[in-house]
Amino acid sequence: EGEVIAMALDLMHAEAVTDGEPVGMVTTGGTGSIIHALLAYREHAAKHRGITRPNFIKPETGHPAFDKGCHLFGIELRKAPIDPKTAQADVDWVADNIDENTIAIMGSACNYGYGTVDPIPELGQVASERG
């Protein structure tokens, strides 16, 4: 496990981290990985941004493990509607629903259930603009 984590940290340029020591973990599947990611987002936002009432935004088509993780960790879940023709996340809705307590947004490539790809570049732009 340690060797795999070391390789992953190398691939992700962990040496560039300046505000702590990079770490990693191996999980047993997608649901566990998603749940651990949400916990990491929550804890990071609490420590670095002082967020005590976190929220997370995902498209309606996002994996249900995000719903479970938000429930387990007391994170408000905001579900973005999808375009009925493309089954992609509504980027304008996401932008309108981000606030100072948003710890992360997500998009899928490809999404759970439909197999379509959310507009990742546009979601990334919204995330960059909103911090």
Predicted regions and their residues:
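Conserved N-terminal alpha-helix of the aminotransferase class I/II PLP-enzyme fold
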Residues: 1-30, 40, 44
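Conserved PLP-enzyme active-site core in the AAT-like
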Residues: 25, 29-131
